[in-house]
């Protein structure tokens, strides 16, 4: 559940406990999904959970892979990243190892310049892979300017959501001074948000929910 979408665990559980009517047959996964989504009270995380389960079941029943269902070529697909969750600094090496199959790593920062640099340096001590950074709305303008310049030197590809979603003024200012592209996350909840952030960010993080 996401607070950004006004969802809570309790609100999700209330819908599930009230009961979801499942169609008897799944001749079409899209129509099957729509029948279930109509009962989800617009709770996007719940819709995504059902969508994943439905597509997985459909592909297994029809003995095809997910990329075959979407008629997609894995070889030409954009490269995705593996997110490293930083808790214990002593476990960074283990976290980096977990992301071995991925060519790109993503790390959440926004804990202050000193801590953020410490985390990136630690990751760099284990790998030279491309890193993507999510500042998680944790910086101010001065920090953003310093960090973006420093992160460029560390082989970082882009910075996601450097400031609070309400702080578009500083985001626009940082974009002028940052050597790295800025990607919107909390500022792009739905497609209707895009006109407001056009020219402020270089791209958006599209959530499949």
Residue spans of the language-model regions?
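N-terminal capping/lid subdomain adjacent to the active-site entrance of alpha/beta enzymes
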Residues: 1-131, 138, 142-145, 149-153
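Catalytic core of soluble alpha/beta enzymes
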Residues: 107-209
């Amino acid at each position: 559940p996401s607070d950004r979408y006004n969802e809570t665990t309790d609100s999700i559980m209330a819908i599930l406990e009230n009961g979801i009517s499942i169609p008897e047959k799944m001749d079409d996964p899209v129509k099957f999904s729509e029948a279930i989504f109509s009962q989800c009270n617009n709770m996007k995380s719940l819709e995504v959970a059902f969508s994943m389960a439905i597509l997985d079941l459909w592909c297994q029943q029809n003995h095809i892979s997910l990329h075959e269902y979407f008629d997609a070529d894995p070889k030409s697909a954009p490269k995705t990243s593996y997110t490293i969750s930083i808790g214990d600094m002593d476990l960074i090496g283990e976290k980096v190892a977990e992301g071995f199959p991925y060519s790109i790593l993503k790390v959440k920062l926004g804990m202050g310049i000193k801590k953020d640099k410490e985390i990136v340096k630690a990751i760099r001590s284990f790998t030279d892979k491309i890193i993507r950074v999510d500042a998680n709305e944790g910086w101010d303008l001065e920090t953003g300017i310093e960090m973006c310049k420093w992160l460029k030197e560390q082989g970082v590809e882009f910075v996601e959501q450097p400031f609070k979603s309400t702080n578009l003024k500083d985001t626009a200012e940082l974009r002028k001074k940052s050597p790295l592209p800025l990607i919107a996350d909390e500022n792009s909840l739905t497609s209707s948000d895009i006109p407001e952030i056009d020219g402020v960010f270089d791209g958006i993080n599209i959530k499949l929910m």
